[in-house]
């Protein structure tokens, strides 16, 4: 092909010699250098879309979209048709071909799944683009600098917010108290990277739900009093049932120094229907801490379900008095507890339940099953699975757990518990 100065079709970037990797369904733009071109023909692997932009001022931008799945059914001509996108440019008797190679990464892109109508499950709750057709949907990238999320929170949110986050070099941050008054869903976009969220002050639930998936939640700055003394509270839930769910799914909660959730213990504040933590690693670096702290909450009847499943809760050194969930005496409840709680398939390393792992007023059921508890033998404390502080008849299942370590006893229930199961005895055999 003759080389002439007024005819060119090429990719403007100089770093396109390697294969360009896409997530399933992802779209990327490539700027072309085009001179003297009269006609073009584009070929792409089966399932891929490649076309020039119709947006004004971007006529020389090639828009490439990967198929929604990684299945490859290639039938096209033009060299290696399983990876090549080729542009044949012509001008009279002259012709030129520009090519790039593309492939789909072997990873999940939750944003692409959402765009293509797939269900995303977070703590048993399904989200998709039909349920959230009116949401404010954002893709945010912390590759080059910290990204502030403050503008996505307010006490008067008119629509749900879904944030797909990517980039691990820097943090996503919030400063000051953040109010949640509609559904807020925060998802690490790619399943093979976990972005970091670092709040400076607490988040206040008002209405809706709060869902996390595939996020590292760094709580290092929440180690003070007042608004830095916990991560999430219910200080804005002023009507029964306004805030339905807090779900943390497939996350890392790092450097826990204060409660993850805290009930503000006011008669005018209501509870959260469902709290779920699953498939999550939790790094605890504090003694005598309740991860979910109902404190002296009044409206206990609003807490319906608590699910704590498939988590790893750990510390480098034994932490005394760690609680998974706690309600403290001191206020007379306005409604009795009806909580159904499941603590299943977890691993606890150096977490000592000397203040009782699960401590509540009344409940309908409690399952603590198929967990592993391992504490360094030098820890001189007893450890207790549960205590109900008022008389009730919940269904109790505290079976198939394995315990190691401690110089003192592992016990099913605290001696002050008004529910005592199993009736055959309180001591748990160590392994």
Which positions does each model-derived feature cover?
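Right-handed parallel beta-helix
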Residues: 183-185, 208-219, 242-255, 270-288, ...
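Solvent-exposed, low-complexity, repeat-rich "mucin-like" stalks and linkers
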Residues: 3-47
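Extracellular beta-strand-rich solenoid/capping regions of secreted or surface-exposed proteins
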Residues: 68-69, 158, 171-186, 194-243
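Acidic, glycine- and Ser/Thr-rich low-complexity intrinsically disordered tracts
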Residues: 115-120, 130, 390-431
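Acidic Gly/Asp/Thr-rich repetitive segments characteristic of extracellular carbohydrate-active
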Residues: 110-166, 171
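A short beta-strand micro-motif common to beta-rich folds, especially ectodomain repeats
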Residues: 1, 72-93
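Extracellular beta-strand/beta-solenoid scaffold signature
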Residues: 175, 196-204, 220-239, 255-269, ...
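Low-complexity "stalk/linker" and mucin-like segments enriched in Ser/Thr/Pro/Ala/Gly
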Residues: 41-67
């Amino acid at each position: 092909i003759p080389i002439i100065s007024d005819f060119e079709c090429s990719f403007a970037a100089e770093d396109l010699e390697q294969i360009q990797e896409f997530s399933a369904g992802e779209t990327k733009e490539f700027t072309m250098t085009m001179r003297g071109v009269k006609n073009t023909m584009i070929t792409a692997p089966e399932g891929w879309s490649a076309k020039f932009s119709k947006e004004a001022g971007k006529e020389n931008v090639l828009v490439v979209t990967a198929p929604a799945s990684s299945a490859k059914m290639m039938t096209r001509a033009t060299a290696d048709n399983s990876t090549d996108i080729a542009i044949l440019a012509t001008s009279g008797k002259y012709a030129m071909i520009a090519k790039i190679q593309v492939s789909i990464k072997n990873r999940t892109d939750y944003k692409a799944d959402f765009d293509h109508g797939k269900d995303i499950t977070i703590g048993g709750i399904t989200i998709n683009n039909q349920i959230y057709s009116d949401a404010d949907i954002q893709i945010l990238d912390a590759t080059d600098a910290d990204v502030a999320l403050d503008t996505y929170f307010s006490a008067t949110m008119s629509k749900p917010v879904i944030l797909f986050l990517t980039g691990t070099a820097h943090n996503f941050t919030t400063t000051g108290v953040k109010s949640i008054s509609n559904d807020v869903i925060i998802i690490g976009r790619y399943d093979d990277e976990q972005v970091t969220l670092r709040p400076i002050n607490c988040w206040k639930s008002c209405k809706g739900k709060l869902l996390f998936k595939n996020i590292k939640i760094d709580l290092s700055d929440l180690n003070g009093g007042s608004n830095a003394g916990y991560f999430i509270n219910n200080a804005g839930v002023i009507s029964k049932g306004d805030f339905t769910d807090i779900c943390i799914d497939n996350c890392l909660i790092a450097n826990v120094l204060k409660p993850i959730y805290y009930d503000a213990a006011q008669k005018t504040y209501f509870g959260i229907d469902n709290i779920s933590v699953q498939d999550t690693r939790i790094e605890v670096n504090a003694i005598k801490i309740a991860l979910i702290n109902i404190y002296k909450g009044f409206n206990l009847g609003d807490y319906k379900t608590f699910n704590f499943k498939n988590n790893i809760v750990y510390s480098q050194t034994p932490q005394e008095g760690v609680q998974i969930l706690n309600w403290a005496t001191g206020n007379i409840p306005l409604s009795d507890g009806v909580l159904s709680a499941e603590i299943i398939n977890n691993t606890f390393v150096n977490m000592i339940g000397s203040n009782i792992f699960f401590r509540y007023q009344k409940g309908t059921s409690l399952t603590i099953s198929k967990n592993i508890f391992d504490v360094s033998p030098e820890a001189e404390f007893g450890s207790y699975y549960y205590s109900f502080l008022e008389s009730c008849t919940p269904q109790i299942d505290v079976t198939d757990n394995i315990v190691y370590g401690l110089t003192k006893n592992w016990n099913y229930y605290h001696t002050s518990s008004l529910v005592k199961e199993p009736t055959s005895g309180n001591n748990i055999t160590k392994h």
